Regions:
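OB-fold ssDNA-binding interfaces and closely related basic DNA-contact patches used
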Residues: 1-82
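Acidic, gly/ser/pro-rich intrinsically disordered tails
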Residues: 1-4, 142-169
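Residue-level recognition of well-ordered beta-strand positions that form the cores
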Residues: 37-39, 115-117, 137
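Beta-hairpin (beta-strand-turn-beta-strand) motif
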Residues: 41, 79, 117-121, 141
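A beta-strand/beta-hairpin structural motif
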Residues: 73-82, 87-101
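Exposed beta-sheet edge/beta-hairpin loop segments within beta-rich domains
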Residues: 91-112, 119-130
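OB-fold/S1-family single-stranded nucleic acid-binding modules
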Residues: 123-144
Length: 169
């Protein structure tokens, strides 16, 4: 299998099973692995990705009227080169890091644009391509009260004058 070097881009992506906090799960009982899954709505693209070695899975339909859905798990690693994650809420962009990315687990996500980078692995002759988040732009839906009571930067307090050690009494 040829080495995959191209990034994947998903505009207006549908993400599922978010675990940005890295909480323990059935598949990661110890926890610490931050992941989410991205839907791949185009069956031809999903097959091409499988052929390249990406780990594309199929989610069985819940209802008989539904179709199976191709998807892929994406890892979120904050190492030497952390992903660029921008949260947009009420037009304000906030850069998220490993300390605050967990808020996306419960956020009402309006839209997501993703860039996923490949990691080609080879373990004892078995090969494949793991998906790692490179960049993500997440627009969050805010309710009208969140907008109304949105935190503004508080005015800075005056710093007390230097104390020379003498008490005023």
């Amino acid at each position: 299998m040829e080495r995959v070097t191209h990034n994947l881009e998903f505009e207006n992506a549908h993400i599922m099973f978010p675990n940005f906090r890295g909480l323990p799960t059935k598949f990661d009982p110890v926890g610490g692995k931050r992941t989410f899954c991205v839907a791949i709505p185009d069956p031809d693209l999903a097959q091409q990705m499988r052929d390249e070695g990406w780990n594309v899975r199929v989610l069985a339909p819940r209802n008989e009227d539904d179709l199976p859905l191709d998807y892929m798990q994406v890892k979120v690693a904050f190492g030497d080169i952390p992903p660029k994650i921008i949260m947009i809420a009420n037009g304000v962009q906030t850069l998220l890091d490993e300390t605050d990315i967990g808020q996306l687990d419960t956020a009402e996500i309006q839209s997501v644009d993703l860039v996923i980078r490949p990691y080609n692995w080879n373990i004892h002759g078995d090969t494949g391509v793991a998906a790692y988040l490179k960049a993500m732009y997440v627009t969050i839906e805010m309710d009208r009260f969140a907008i109304k009571y949105e935190q503004r930067e508080a005015p800075r307090r005056r710093q007390p004058e230097k104390d020379d050690g003498d008490l005023p009494f």
